[in-house]
Amino acid sequence: MRTNCIYPGTFDPITNGHLDVIKRALRIFDNVIVAVAKSDNKKPFFELDKRVEMVKEATKSLENIEVIAFENLLVDFAKSQDTCFVIRGLRAVSDFEYELQLGYANRSLWDKFETIYLMPTIKYSFISSSIVRSIFEHGGDISHLVPKEILPFLEDKKC
């Protein structure tokens, strides 16, 4: 039996930290479904279709990856993908508090739902999409923070 997991997020934009978690999840699971959340409440920098396209570009060299947009409850999305496993990255203690609450909430909706927390490799532990956006919006170099495949998407945003 092949085991799938979901790695959900807004990926606005996808970072090297996200990519690190995806690669490490592939060492545990046969397939990783990268679930790009609509997240209108976050007022995304990129539209949903662009974020999906960026994730596909950033992961095109990896096998056993599927990129799918979703806008419903994560547990419902997981059921539709026939998996009960979700991967979440933890950078700091502050992430843990929030993720623990989400994990409990999801588990209350579906008792088979399992959240697996992965710490990023230390060199990526400070990277977040919001930090990348802030540096980018102030003209800083983000080339070491994001996959090279998405730099053209960011350059297009400058225009």
From Swiss-Prot:
Annotated metabolic or biological route of this protein: Cofactor biosynthesis; coenzyme A biosynthesis; CoA from (R)-pantothenate: step 4/5
One Pfam family matching this protein: CTP_transf_like
Keywords, sorted A to Z: ATP-binding, Coenzyme A biosynthesis, Cytoplasm, Magnesium, Nucleotide-binding, Nucleotidyltransferase, Transferase
Any GO BP: coenzyme A biosynthetic process
GO MF assignments: ATP binding; pantetheine-phosphate adenylyltransferase activity
Catalysed transformations (reactions): (R)-4'-phosphopantetheine + ATP + H(+) = 3'-dephospho-CoA + diphosphate
Biological function: Reversibly transfers an adenylyl group from ATP to 4'-phosphopantetheine, yielding dephospho-CoA (dPCoA) and pyrophosphate.
Protein name in UniProt: Phosphopantetheine adenylyltransferase
Gene3D superfamilies referenced in this protein's UniProt entry, alphabetically: HUPs (3.40.50.620)
Family indicated by similarity: Belongs to the bacterial CoaD family.
SS bond partners: none
Annotated site residues (Transition state stabilizer) in this chain: 18
Compartment annotation: Cytoplasm
Source organism (scientific name): Campylobacter hominis (strain ATCC BAA-381 / DSM 21671 / CCUG 45161 / LMG 19568 / NCTC 13146 / CH001A)
Binding-site list for substrate: 10, 42, 74, 88
GO cellular component terms given for this protein: cytoplasm
HAMAP family, alphabetized: PPAT_bact (MF_00151)
Known EC number: 2.7.7.3
